[in-house]
Amino acid sequence: MTLQEEIIRQLGVKASIDPQEEIRKAVDFLKAYLRKHSFLKTYVLGISGGQDSTLAGKLAQMAIAELREEASDQAYQFIAVRLPYGVQADEADAQKALAFIAPDQTLTINIKAAVDGQVEALQAAGVEISDFNKGNIKARQRMISQYAIAGQMAGAVIGTDHAAENITGFFTKFGDGGADILPLFRLNKRQGKALLKVLGADAALYEKVPTADLEDQKPGLADEVALGVTYQDIDDYLEGKLISKVAQATIEKWWHKGQHKRHLPITIFDDFWK
């Protein structure tokens, strides 16, 4: 088995999908998790205005709406959370995403004071924080807020990790990579876009340039620039297609580099890192 085949196997990616079938599969998955854990009544998800959180949010709201009706239990709620750092440049996109999702509840927590306070505390201790590292603090602070909300509201936190993100390790360890449930896992970027099209999302929500937008000194830095490879190449690779040797080497480099992010903390019994 080639490395490409092994990665595809691990991430469960199909070469082609039926968007309607994948929507139903994700909604049923989200419903089943709450049914199994009867002490949970809500899903919590940060909404940025990008493709991934828009799709995960819509699927979550659909699942909660069905559960609420089927169980005749109004306690089932989907809580969308806006988590800007100061003023978000593409706030209009975030509002457009919320209008499309139509969540039961929307909360806004501005993380700027918490992030800046942490950076200042570290600097006071003599630890200078790089702009890149500060970006990771932002991602982790967003998850602190989401878990605080979930803890108070009998909730589980939804993550937006999908195959094109997982293969490159393009997420913050214990930041956006930390969640309870991943409804998009198995889908690549273009497949997620296909689901949003079927769901009737505004094209602007899935045609915009993907960006983590975590660094102050590189606002709106495109994912593809940061990774050095296009999502088209990543998606093609995940669908078992041939791509250029340069693109393949870049993708596989990120796969190896990000292995530690796909595991729980390393124990003496683990050998994946050796």
UniProtKB/Swiss-Prot annotation:
E.C. designation(s): 6.3.1.5
Function recorded in the entry: Catalyzes the ATP-dependent amidation of deamido-NAD to form NAD. Uses ammonia as a nitrogen source.
Residues reported in the UniProt entry to bind ATP: G46, I47, S48, G49, G50, Q51, D52, S53, T160, K189, T211
Pathway info: Cofactor biosynthesis; NAD(+) biosynthesis; NAD(+) from deamido-NAD(+) (ammonia route): step 1/1
Protein name: NH(3)-dependent NAD(+) synthetase
Keyword list, A-Z: ATP-binding, Ligase, Magnesium, Metal-binding, NAD, Nucleotide-binding
NCBIfam families: nadE, PRK00768.1
GO molecular function terms listed in the Swiss-Prot or TrEMBL record: ATP binding; glutaminase activity; metal ion binding; NAD+ synthase (glutamine-hydrolyzing) activity; NAD+ synthase activity
Species the sequence originates in: Streptococcus pyogenes serotype M1
A GO-annotated cellular component: cytoplasm
Tree of life domain: Bacteria
Subunit description: Homodimer.
Binding site for Mg(2+): D52, E165
Disulfide links within the chain: none
